[in-house]
């Protein structure tokens, strides 16, 4: 390069060009790219007057106007990138100038939109105020009960007839489109309206569209002339029918959540009943169990009416010694049949309380647990069971591996936040094995905890309901525990739940037998159907491959009609679920959860349907560590297989697009879009299988709690506790931190009007942020510390309202990012031979993306970018 430039150019220009070449090389450009960059520079100086002030201003704004082009490290096709970006800048600049006045009119539309939203937000309250006088009046009050029931029956009958006509009426494409526009317009009108009316209206609209879709699928979309297409189409129709049934049952289940509130206890404590607290354990570490016992000892309940029992199925001497030391009862079985259910039933022979509260050994109850739950038992004598949420202060594998802890609702939030509350409306609340209180008399009547299935909790509540007893659910978290530490343990737990619910379906089917109301039967049925999602989910993940690989028409209809039926069905269901479930499950996350579990719950549920007695009980491990970040290749193997299968479908789809019949082009495009969506979801499943490092034995809990620290010299400083664990705390001193690392200080915390002192040592000081490690505590101090932290009545209730509002489009974008993240992890942890393929694909995608124009960075707005571009056009 140097010799050639000296031969062709005068010395000053040659030296300048050589200096530029060396600069390119220092910034990482290859010799070819550096030489080509110099050549493009020469041509640019020849063609354009780059020394002119106008061009100098453009060059000064290079980073803002051309953010994706590195001028210090040229690439061979940079001129093409400059050309595309310049045309883009000219286009958006002229568009902005042309449409600037119109935005003022759009501001008026925005103002009208804001007023409409305000009007809709206040509509329910205005209607309530206008109709208050009607609450005491009954339009049909002069009629007998029989006449009123007859009129209601006539109304329901005519409504069903109209609904049937609406669902089954065939439309041509234009009529179907207009019908959908009307429904969509109504949905957009009511979706922002607060209160339950809007949710009910959205459910009606969603059911209308979905029922029309399923009717159309059964009557118009099966190819009876092609056996392969017929078989594949029936398989997909089976999965869609399952999804439709779950959708309908789900709407019924949560249509009117009860939101039960506590009932005050009698002021006279002598009327309070006796309670036994059971803490069953098998192979958990003693440190996991201690906090639960310490919290139980501090529950606000008369000590002579409270007995705490450690039910140790491991028969460990350390647990016996601990129980004796803290003053609680200890029971160890000589035989271990029926696992946890047998352990509890054995303890029932020894305990004599009127009620029994059950906590898993890692679930730490709050001090208010019994005061919040027991009032309902005294009010309703037929109430047999009160369930509270299972709240977790540690992230589950989805939250930890994806970095979403306390950013999006976790997998269980929907069940404990909405579904159980909806069940409560229909008197169908399930016993969940922990964080619950059961009345002894009904429990003894059914022979104790059910032992016939591995989900003894749900089966027990089913038996109680069959006996005519009621159940209740209170959505306020009154205990918190440890989530599963690894994805494999999480999947193992879900396998047990799935198999157990299917066992109940086979052995004690809620649809049959006496004692249950129709609503209870439907709620139990939906719970069992939920765990049968494995096979339908796998069908959805592979369905488009039937056409791409086998040329089978799984939906035998024109692409236009498919779009007019499928898209509204999905959009209305998503919109309705976002309205109903938004606080508890963000849009599209169910796809990730079900995909991760599908492969693993499909075989055991299928086996349980055939042979419900096959299989064994497994205990979910808690409190483990993940020493290093790694991909669980065993768990992720099915996802990778499905990814490869879908990539094969992409290749087949590309071939069909270019070489297949022209009349199938739209069908190929629709199938490829479906495949790409499946690949995104599978990428998310792969991302979950990358186990993040977890080296803390004691999980930190975020909180905002006032406190104080006292130095040994007597100086006192107020502070705010922002996190705590079983071994230490993080605090923020209100003012300048006047403590040193290694210094011993006392931490002062309040519970009610009582103040407690805990010895600590400073282990970290960063500004006014201080890390404290607890010094060895006495048993009394440890109990007090748990009472001031884990067992505070308000610790967990504040977490429920901390999640952001669900926005379906933003949630979809999160899922897309998550899918790409999964493939990036595959490239990161793959064997060297596979890494080459991933790196090549990544490089190819990055090269293609580098040509896409970008919006100018914000710095360009500081300079008059429109004027600069106008100068470039001159």
Swiss-Prot record:
Pfam families reported in the protein's UniProt record: Glycos_transf_2, PilZ
Active-site residues per Swiss-Prot or TrEMBL entry: 313, 457
EC number: 2.4.1.12
Main location: membrane
UniProt cross-references to InterPro entries, sorted A to Z: Cell_synth_A, Glyco_trans_2-like, Glycosyltr_2/OpgH_subfam, Nucleotide-diphossugar_trans, PilZ_domain
Record field: catalytic activity: [(1->4)-beta-D-glucosyl](n) + UDP-alpha-D-glucose = [(1->4)-beta-D-glucosyl](n+1) + UDP + H(+)
Keyword Glycosyltransferase: yes
UniProt membrane topology term: Multi-pass membrane protein
Protein name: Cellulose synthase catalytic subunit [UDP-forming]
UniProt source species: Salmonella typhimurium (strain LT2 / SGSC1412 / ATCC 700720)
Gene: bcsA
Pathway annotation from the record: Glycan metabolism; bacterial cellulose biosynthesis
């Amino acid at each position: 390069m140097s010799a050639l430039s000296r031969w062709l150019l005068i010395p000053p220009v040659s030296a300048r060009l050589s200096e530029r070449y060396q600069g390119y090389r220092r910034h990482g450009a290859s010799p070819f790219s550096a030489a080509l960059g110099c050549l493009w520079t020469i041509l640019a100086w020849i063609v354009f007057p780059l020394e002119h002030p106008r061009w100098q201003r453009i060059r000064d704004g290079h980073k803002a106007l051309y953010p994706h082009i590195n001028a210090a490290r040229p690439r061979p096709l940079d001129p093409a990138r400059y050309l595309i970006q310049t045309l883009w800048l000219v286009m958006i600049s002229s568009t902005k100038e042309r449409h600037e006045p119109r935005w003022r009119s759009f501001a008026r539309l925005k103002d009208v939109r804001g007023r409409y939203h305000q009007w809709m937000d206040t509509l329910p309250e205005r209607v309530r105020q206008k109709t208050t006088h009607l609450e005491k009046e009954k339009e049909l009050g002069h009629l007998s009960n029989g006449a009123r029931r007859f009129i209601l029956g006539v109304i329901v009958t005519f409504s069903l007839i109209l609904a049937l006509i609406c669902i089954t009426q065939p439309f041509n494409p234009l009529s179907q489109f207009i019908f959908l526009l009307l429904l969509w317009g109504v949905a957009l009108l009511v979706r922002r309206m607060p209160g339950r009316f809007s949710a009910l209206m959205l459910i009606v609209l969603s059911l209308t569209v979905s029922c029309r879709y399923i009717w159309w699928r059964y009557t118009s979309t099966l190819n009876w002339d092609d056996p392969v297409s017929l078989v594949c189409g029936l398989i997909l129709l089976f999965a869609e029918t399952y999804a439709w049934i779950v959708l309908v049952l789900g709407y019924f289940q949560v249509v009117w959540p009860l939101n039960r509130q506590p009932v005050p206890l009698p002021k006279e404590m002598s009327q309070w009943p006796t309670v036994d607290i059971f803490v069953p354990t098998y192979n958990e570490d003693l440190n996991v169990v201690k906090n639960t016992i310490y919290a139980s000892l501090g529950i606000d309940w008369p000590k002579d009416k409270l007995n705490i029992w450690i039910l140790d199925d491991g028969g460990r001497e350390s647990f016996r010694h601990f129980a004796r030391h803290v003053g609680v009862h200890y029971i160890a079985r000589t035989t271990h049949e029926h696992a946890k259910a047998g352990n509890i039933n054995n303890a029932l022979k020894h305990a004599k309380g009127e009620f029994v509260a059950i906590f898993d050994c890692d679930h730490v109850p709050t001090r208010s647990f019994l005061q919040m739950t027991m009032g309902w038992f005294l009010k309703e004598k037929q109430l047999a069971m009160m369930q509270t949420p299972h709240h977790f202060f540690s992230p589950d594998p989805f939250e930890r591996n994806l970095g979403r802890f306390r950013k999006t609702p976790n997998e269980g939030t929907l069940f404990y936040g909405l579904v159980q509350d909806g069940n409560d409306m229909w008197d169908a609340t399930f016993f969940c094995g922990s964080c619950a209180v059961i009345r002894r008399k009904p429990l003894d009547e059914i022979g104790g905890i059910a032992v016939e299935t591995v989900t003894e909790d749900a089966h027990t509540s089913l038996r109680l309901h069959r006996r005519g007893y009621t159940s209740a659910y209170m959505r306020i978290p009154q205990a918190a525990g440890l989530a599963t530490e690894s994805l494999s343990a999480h999947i193992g737990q879900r396998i047990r739940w799935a198999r157990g619910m299917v066992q109940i379906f086979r052995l004690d089917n809620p649809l049959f037998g006496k004692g249950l109301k129709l609503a209870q039967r439907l709620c139990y049925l939906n719970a069992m159907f939920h765990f049968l999602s494995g096979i339908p989910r796998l069908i959805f993940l592979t369905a488009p491959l039937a056409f791409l690989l086998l040329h089978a028409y799984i939906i035998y209809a024109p692409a236009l009609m498919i779009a007019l039926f499928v898209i509204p069905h999905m959009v209305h269901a998503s919109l309705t679920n976002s309205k109903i479930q938004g606080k508890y499950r963000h849009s599209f996350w169910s796809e990730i959860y079900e995909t991760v579990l599908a492969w693993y719950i499909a075989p055991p549920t299928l086996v349980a349907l055939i042979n419900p007695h096959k299989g064994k009980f497994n205990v979910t491990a808690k409190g483990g560590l993940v020493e290093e970040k790694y991909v669980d290749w065993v768990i992720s193997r099915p996802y990778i297989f499905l990814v490869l299968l879908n990539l094969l479908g992409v290749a087949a789809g590309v071939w069909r697009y270019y070489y297949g019949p022209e009349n199938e082009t739209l069908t190929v495009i629709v199938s490829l879009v479906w495949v790409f969506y499946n690949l995104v979801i599978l990428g998310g499943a792969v991302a979950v299988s990358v186990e993040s490092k977890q080296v803390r034995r004691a999980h930190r809990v975020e909180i905002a709690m006032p406190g104080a620290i006292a130095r040994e010299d007597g100086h006192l400083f107020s502070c705010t506790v922002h996190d705590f664990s079983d071994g230490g705390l993080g605090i923020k001193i209100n003012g300048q931190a006047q403590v040193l690392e290694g210094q011993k200080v006392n931490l002062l915390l309040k519970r009610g009007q009582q103040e407690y002192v805990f010895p600590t040592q400073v282990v970290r000081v960063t500004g006014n942020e201080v890390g404290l490690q607890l010094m060895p505590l006495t048993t009394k101090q440890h109990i007090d510390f748990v009472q001031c932290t884990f067992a505070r009545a308000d610790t967990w209730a504040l977490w429920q309202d901390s999640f952001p509002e669900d926005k379906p489009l933003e949630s979809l974008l999160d899922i897309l990012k998550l899918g790409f993240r999964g493939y990036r992890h595959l490239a990161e942890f793959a064997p060297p031979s596979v890494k080459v393929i991933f790196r090549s694909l990544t490089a190819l995608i990055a090269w293609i993306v580098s040509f896409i124009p970008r919006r100018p960075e914000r710095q360009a707005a500081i300079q008059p970018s429109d004027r600069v571009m106008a100068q470039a056009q001159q």
